[in-house]
Amino acid sequence: MGLSEAEWQLVLHVWAKVEADLSGHGQEILIRLFKGHPETLEKFDKFKHLKSEAEMKASEDLKKHGHTVLTALGGILKKKGHHEAELKPLAQSHATKHKIPIKYLEFISDAIIHVLHSRHPSDFGADAQAAMTKALELFRKDIAAKYKELGFHG
């Protein structure tokens, strides 16, 4: 399940492009998540009232949350699989406070892949997509293990 150094380099190369606009990427990813899987919106009291894509695009709170999500994910990706310290508090909050099912992390992973491909097609070809998919699967597998330790089977 681990990634090779070459795969991590592909992941981190495209992630550098994401970091140039964390808020914009994050907002677009969350909008794609909420539009594709409206049930996920119910986990966010702050965003439940946002019904249209236009409302979502106008929401500064959504943009800020997108920035927060991608900042955390970037910190995890940069650890190249050695993300225990970063993952623990994230798993704790997502399992016990927010109660986010692993399935929702799959949904956001799909949204991430889609947005990166649409925004950075020349930097996110098949090899980079495969590497990012693998990195996100590793993240989900490890967070699922933490969920289990915490007694959350979401």
Curated annotation (Swiss-Prot):
Enumerate the residues binding O2.
Answer: H65
Please give the Gene Ontology molecular function terms for this protein: heme binding; metal ion binding; nitrite reductase activity; oxygen binding; oxygen carrier activity; peroxidase activity
* Gene Ontology CC, one term: extracellular exosome
Q: Where in the cell is it found?
A: Cytoplasm, Sarcoplasm
The alphabetized UniProt keywords are: Cytoplasm, Heme, Iron, Metal-binding, Muscle protein, Oxidoreductase, Oxygen transport, Phosphoprotein, Transport
Return the EC number.
1.7.-.-, 1.11.1.-
Q: Which reaction does it catalyse?
A: Fe(III)-heme b-[protein] + nitric oxide + H2O = Fe(II)-heme b-[protein] + nitrite + 2 H(+); H2O2 + AH2 = A + 2 H2O
Q: Which Pfam families does the protein's record reference?
A: Globin
Occurrences of domain Globin (ranges): 2-148
Q: List the disulfide bonds.
A: none
Q: Which residues bind heme b?
A: H94
In this UniProt entry, the residues modified to Phosphothreonine are: T68
Source domain of life:
Eukaryota
Locate the residues binding nitrite. H65
Record-linked Gene3D superfamilies: 6.10.140.2100, 6.10.140.2110
Q: Name one GO biological process term.
A: removal of superoxide radicals
Residue list for modification Phosphoserine: S4
Q: What does this protein do?
A: Monomeric heme protein which primary function is to store oxygen and facilitate its diffusion within muscle tissues. Reversibly binds oxygen through a pentacoordinated heme iron and enables its timely and efficient release as needed during periods of heightened demand. Depending on the oxidative conditions of tissues and cells, and in addition to its ability to bind oxygen, it also has a nitrite reductase activity whereby it regulates the production of bioactive nitric oxide.
- Subunit-structure text: Monomeric.
What family is reported?
Belongs to the globin family.
Name of the protein: Myoglobin
What species was this sequence derived from?
Ziphius cavirostris
Lineage of the source organism? Eukaryota, Metazoa, Chordata, Craniata, Vertebrata
